[in-house]
Every structure is written in structure tokens, then in C-alpha cells.
Amino acid sequence: EFSRIQVGEGGLLTAGAGALLSRVVNEALKAELSGLESCVGIPGTVGGAVSMDAGTRREWIGQRVRDVVTLRPGEGLHRYEASEIEWGYRCTSIPTSEIVLEATFQLERGQKQAIAEEMEARLRRRRSSQPMGRPCCGSVFRNPPERSAGILIESCGLKGAMAGGAQISEEHANFIVNTGRASAADVVSLMGRAHDAVRDRFDIDLACEVKLLGFGA
């Protein structure tokens, strides 16, 4: 059951890799468990969030992981303690050949109202600067050291640029939104355009934050 969410004793919460991160955050709130407030508003599933160490510059999901279960091709299940995993900026040391099946988070008891207020405050900040009303895959490039990928792309005049049904968000240029009928190829086309523009103008090679499947490097 890849989408199951189970609240255990001692502040533990276990979620299958297919569970939406938004559901996990809400279940933590219902159980009056604090620690995942920084994940509110982040799209995607637990598997993707753990594999990419989703979060912000100051807080990331790996800080709350107790252990992760993966499937090793040809070997079977393997459990990693959080301390065995190297957590980096939008990456982990979990081999890409392994499939994340579930993760257990260590949370703390809190007051439901305080947790909800913190989540709402964070959601307001995201809504004020990110395209929360349209489908997207989150930010598409990693921020270079001491720079903002969104500001770099915006400085190249690409806010609002389109390819098919995909558009570089007019709210935050490091997001590509689906205006209705965007294909993956449309998104990748815009990513390439933004990458090349930033490289040509600033001599900065933006690294992809999203993982591309079925496309060349």
C-alpha cells in the first residue's frame, strides 16, 4: 500500500512513497504532531520528497526522517537509518537504482492550533511568491550559491515565456506552469531556453532540480 499513512506512538508517522506530501502534512496536523510545517504547499509525493530532500534553504525533510525503506534491484528490501543517508540540497545519497517505498518521520507533540497557524503562515508566504493556483512540478532549477535561479531567469526577460501549453510563471520565474494542455516536451523546451539564457548572460550553468525521465541529458 504505497499511499498509506500511519501515525504511531512516540511522534512517529510512517507514509508510503505514493502518499501525497500534502496528505502527510494534514495527517500530522490532525494527530497534533509538529515538524512538517515547512512542507506545506510542496507538491508531489513522499517518495519524491525524500529522494530529493524537499524543503527550503533552512529546513529540509531529511531533518525529520527516522528511516527509509527502499527496494534494491535483485536484492530486495533495504532499510536506511536517517544517519546513514547523506542529505544534500535537493539530493540524497540513496542510489538512483533503488526505489523508495516508505519513510518514517520523527515528529513532536504540539498544539493543533499553533501547528495550523504556522502552516497557514507558511502557505501565505508561498502563495505570495509562487504559482499555487496552477499545476506545476515545483521549482525546476537549483539555486546557485548565493543566487536565486528565479531572479536570474527573470533578469533574462523570460517571465511569461511559453512553449505549447507550458509557461514560465509570471509570479516566480523558477516555476513552469501548465496553462491547460502542456506536454513534458513543452516544459523541457522552456527549461532549455531558460538554462541557455542564464548561461549566456551570467555564465552560470543552472542545475536541474527536477528529474527528467525519457529525455537526454
Region spans (language model):
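Gly/Ser/Thr-rich beta-alpha loop segments that engage phosphate groups in nucleotides
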Residues: L20, P43-V50, R57, V140, ...
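Structural signature of FAD isoalloxazine-binding scaffolds in flavoprotein oxidoreductases
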Residues: E1-R4, V50-E81, P95-E102
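Phosphate/pyrophosphate- and phosphate-bearing ligand-binding catalytic cores of soluble enzymes
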Residues: L71-G192, D196-A217
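A generic local secondary-structure boundary/capping motif
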Residues: V25-A28, L36-V40, V50-W60, V68, ...
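Short beta-strand or tight-loop elements
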Residues: S34, R64, S83-I85
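Residues embedded in well-ordered beta-strands within globular domains across many folds
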Residues: Q6, E37, V69, V210-K211
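Anion-binding (especially nucleotide phosphate/pyrophosphate-binding) glycine-rich loop
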Residues: E1-V46
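Short glycine/serine/threonine-biased micro-segments
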Residues: G16, C39-V46, D53, C136, ...
